[in-house]
Regions:
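Acidic, low-complexity, intrinsically disordered interaction modules
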Residues: 19, 23-107
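Short, extreme N-terminal segment that most often corresponds to the first beta-strand
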Residues: 1-28
Length: 117
């Protein structure tokens, strides 16, 4: 079955303190063909993690939570959301039918990576 993937990131502007949501340019296609029995939140979480690492700039320091910093504010801890919608016959997302989703901040993604090794 065809699914359409949408991924966004919420970044906090350090000057204004405002949170800005932007689309993530996916490293893999937005339209995917996946067996319906395999499409679930775990699939979405795995894809979200892989998209984060595909977009990750090694020059960026690891994310830190507020209790790990002197300023008592999160650092490099952007929040990512990936939503999977069923796709229409012409490959467009059917926004009324969400198939799966995942939402994690960068700190959680790094924590997952530590458990892999």
């Amino acid at each position: 079955m065809k699914y359409y993937i949408e991924c966004t990131v919420n970044k906090k502007d350090p000057l204004t303190g405002r949170t800005i949501e932007t689309d993530v340019d996916l490293s893999l296609p937005y339209l995917v063909d996946v067996e319906p029995s395999q499409m679930n939140d775990e699939w979405a979480k795995a894809r979200l993690i892989s998209e984060y690492w595909a977009d990750f700039d090694p020059a960026t320091p690891a994310p830190r939570m507020w209790w790990e910093t002197d300023s008592e504010k999160d650092e490099n801890n952007d929040h990512y959301t990936l939503i999977v919608y069923t796709a229409t016959d012409d490959g467009e997302p059917d926004f009324d039918n969400m198939a799966a989703g995942a939402s994690m901040d960068a700190w959680e993604i790094w924590k997952e990576k530590k458990h892999e090794h």
